[in-house]
Regions:
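Catalytic alpha-helical scaffold of carbohydrate-active enzymes acting on polysaccharides/glycoconjugates
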Residues: 64, 68, 72, 88-89, ...
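Active-site proximal beta-strand in glycosyltransferases
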Residues: 91-106
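A charged, aromatic-enriched C-terminal amphipathic alpha-helix characteristic of glycosyltransferases
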Residues: 296-330
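Nucleotide-sugar donor-binding catalytic core of glycosyltransferases
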Residues: 1-48, 58-62, 70, 78-85, ...
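Conserved acidic donor-binding segment of nucleotide-sugar-dependent glycosyltransferases
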Residues: 278-285, 294-300
Length: 333
């Protein structure tokens, strides 16, 4: 099948993994991003589309034309800010092509609600709350689609785990953009006397001095991310506050890598996990700190839980699983 993807080409992005998985499954993939139609840095281009309506129309009209030239059997869009006219033009010119949207982010990231203004054939999103809202209130053809892991990227390091933990020498790792809510939680853990390493982007608008010394000044991806997470005793994964009944992509990636994580409790985790969720989740920051201190002294239990989760997630929660599910729901598989 010939499939077009409209979205980012960055390594370790959702679109990267969709592209990789569809190719792995034997499909032909045409992948187009904004940078393919205009050579302006993403940040400047993004704000230009916000400020100048004609520019926004122009960019996405060019993208629509490129997709139409390819005449794919299926178009997968992921950006939340794709102009509705782009989708309309593709569907007008490709009558037999299905055009869908996959939204992997928390429900606070709908931009100007372009997704709702566009006539996609189907919508896929990860939170049952917004799935119900889209189906029941707007009568949109919406399906539940959790996040996933890429087995060719998110996989365990082939090293002795105890030796790697000694080399990495990190009790608790937190990674990603250090938003204020995440920084405040990190502060609480650090103030309790726990050795925390922070990887990713610090919050330069509202920095917290007490966590500055814990930053490693490194953004981790790929093999390096797998090495750091697998070699850390505990990965603390605090979900965005807008994850109403969903899990972030880190939840799946960490389990795919085989690292041991503690994360926020959500009822939906019971659907994903091979392990009793009470063992690795918390409902308060005090409970998180208590469990961190407990598991730091339980290496064999940590390794047992994470190994079981890793095997389960590689069997049930890969992007290949998700792509097959999508194609089945669209009657294309």
């Amino acid at each position: 099948m010939n499939i077009a993807i409209i979205g980012s080409k960055d390594f370790d992005s959702l679109e990267y993994h969709i592209h990789d998985s569809l190719t792995f499954l034997g499909h032909e993939v045409f992948h187009i991003d904004i940078s393919d139609v205009i050579k302006i840095p993403y940040r400047y281009n993004y704000y230009a589309t916000k400020l100048f309506k004609k520019y926004d129309d122009y960019i996405f009209d060019k993208i629509a034309n490129k997709v139409i030239e390819q005449a794919p059997d299926l178009v997968i869009a992921t950006y939340r800010f794709i102009h509705p006219n782009c989708i309309k033009k593709i569907k007008t010119n490709l009558r037999n092509t299905k055009v869908i949207h996959i939204n992997p982010d928390a429900i606070t990231t709908f931009e100007n609600q372009q997704v709702f203004a566009s006539d996609y054939d189907a919508y896929f999103t990860k939170d049952s709350f917004i799935v119900d809202f889209m189906k029941d209130k707007m009568k949109l053809n919406t399906f539940y689609l959790p996040e996933a892991l890429n087995p060719r990227v998110h996989k365990p390091i082939k090293r002795d785990r105890f030796q790697l933990e000694n080399e990495i020498n990190i009790d608790v790792t937190m990674f990603g953009t250090m938003y204020p809510y995440r920084a405040r939680m990190a502060s609480e853990v650090i103030d309790s006397g726990i050795n925390v390493a922070l990887f990713g982007v610090p919050d330069r608008r509202f920095p917290r001095e007490e966590i500055t010394k814990s930053f490693r000044n490194e953004y981790i991806t790929g093999d390096r991310k797998a090495e750091v997470l697998f070699g850390s005793k505990i990965v603390l994964n605090n979900f965005h506050y807008a994850e109403i009944n969903s899990a972030n992509v880190k939840f799946f990636e960490i389990n795919g890598i085989g690292a041991f994580q503690l994360c926020d409790y959500k009822p939906v985790l019971e659907e994903y996990s091979a392990v009793d969720v009470e063992k690795f989740t918390y409902k308060t920051i005090d409970e998180a700190i208590e469990k961190i201190k407990y598991f730091l002294d339980q290496p064999l239990l940590r390794h047992e839980i994470s190994k079981k989760q890793c095997e389960h997630f590689h069997k049930h929660h890969t992007y290949e699983n998700r792509m097959k599910d999508i194609l089945n729901k669209l009657n294309l598989f």
